[in-house]
Amino acid sequence: MSANDRRDRRVRVAVVFGGRSNEHAISCVSAGSILRNLDSRRFDVIAVGITPAGSWVLTDANPDALTITNRELPQVKSGSGTELALPADPRRGGQLVSLPPGAGEVLESVDVVFPVLHGPYGEDGTIQGLLELAGVPYVGAGVLASAVGMDKEFTKKLLAADGLPVGAYAVLRPPRSTLHRQECERLGLPVFVKPARGGSSIGVSRVSSWDQLPAAVARARRHDPKVIVEAAISGRELECGVLEMPDGTLEASTLGEIRVAGVRGREDSFYDFATKYLDDAAELDVPAKVDDQVAEAIRQLAIRAFAAIDCRGLARVDFFLTDDGPVINEINTMPGFTTISMYPRMWAASGVDYPTLLATMIETALARGVGLH
């Protein structure tokens, strides 16, 4: 459909959320916040939930059902709506069809998909590949950048190859579960042990003695067979949002800071899942109190990191600010959009309100279209 045709009516947006990853619930909460803030005068919104088992269902787009209430996490349940599929056929023009196979009734047709999916089977290039095959424009990074951004090892490799500062790390692939002596000496203690392709701090452990490493690796492997062991970096935790405009230019937001020292009374606390989403315990400063020159240097590093992995649309780049300068921790190609998430808060502090931010992402997706760029 042409841009002129879309001007005559509201743009039809499919917000896709949930999914098969262990970040299912946070995806639901992000989607609830997005559904609440999309401008209904400009966008006709369809909510598509993916169950933990992988079924796609057409839901009623009620954002109130997609919140954390009394520490209870939301979930897309089987039978909560009509099951559907997106045929990988560009001739179908973004049609969502009913299941079971053979029914084929066209339920909806969409102009653009907003894949609010966190973790594997969504944020990692898989749904982006499906949308490319189906010929449907979508918000956010393409297949390559999504896959790279999901994998902490390859993110660090690409950033380092581009001359960007990253911390020391080692990778454990099955069946290996221990570090070599030289790796232990290079990393030092403490270290953080993480699923290499995970997010929301799920499965992450802080290890302060090497005898704790096997248990930490086993915990991480409940979520991903590949484990990354990162040297602890002493410094302030800063974040920066990058946003692509419809004309392809990139802008970086004001910085945000996460302060977690002593959270829940422990000096070894870190920004784990409970601190992020359940306990409301971390302190978030937006804008961060950082010298103007340092802040601008970090903003430029964020844009360079975005370009280094060939990202598109949006990303949140996480840093440590050390005595020796900033170090890039990771890139989130589909950051959280919950009510407490840093990405929309940083843009709000930069003068871009939530509805405008979402509209810009959708406009950029439509301007980009699909295919090779």
UniProtKB/Swiss-Prot annotation:
Obligatory cofactor(s): Mg(2+); Mn(2+)
Pathway the protein contributes to: Cell wall biogenesis; peptidoglycan biosynthesis
Location relative to the cell: Cytoplasm
Cystine bridges: none
A Pfam family hit: Dala_Dala_lig_N
Gene coding for it: ddl
Record-linked InterPro entries: ATP-grasp, ATP_grasp_subdomain_1, D-Ala_lig_Van_CS, D_ala_D_ala, Dala_Dala_lig_C, Dala_Dala_lig_N, PreATP-grasp_dom_sf
Family per similarity comment: Belongs to the D-alanine--D-alanine ligase family.
Binding site for ATP: 184-239
Record-given protein name: D-alanine--D-alanine ligase
UniProt KW keywords: ATP-binding, Cell shape, Cell wall biogenesis/degradation, Cytoplasm, Ligase, Magnesium, Manganese, Metal-binding, Nucleotide-binding, Peptidoglycan synthesis
Membrane as UniProt keyword: no
Entry binding sites for Mg(2+) 1: D318, E330
Lineage of origin: Bacteria, Bacillati, Actinomycetota, Actinomycetes, Mycobacteriales
PROSITE patterns referenced in this protein's UniProt entry, alphabetically: ATP_GRASP, DALA_DALA_LIGASE_1, DALA_DALA_LIGASE_2
Domain ATP-grasp: start-end pairs: 156-363
Superkingdom: Bacteria
Organism name: Mycobacterium tuberculosis (strain CDC 1551 / Oshkosh)
Reaction equation(s) it catalyzes: 2 D-alanine + ATP = D-alanyl-D-alanine + ADP + phosphate + H(+)
UniProt-annotated binding residues for Mg(2+) 2: E330, N332
GO MF annotation terms: ATP binding; D-alanine-D-alanine ligase activity; metal ion binding
Cofactor binding, note field: Binds 2 magnesium or manganese ions per subunit.
An individual GO BP term: cell wall organization
Protein role: Cell wall formation.
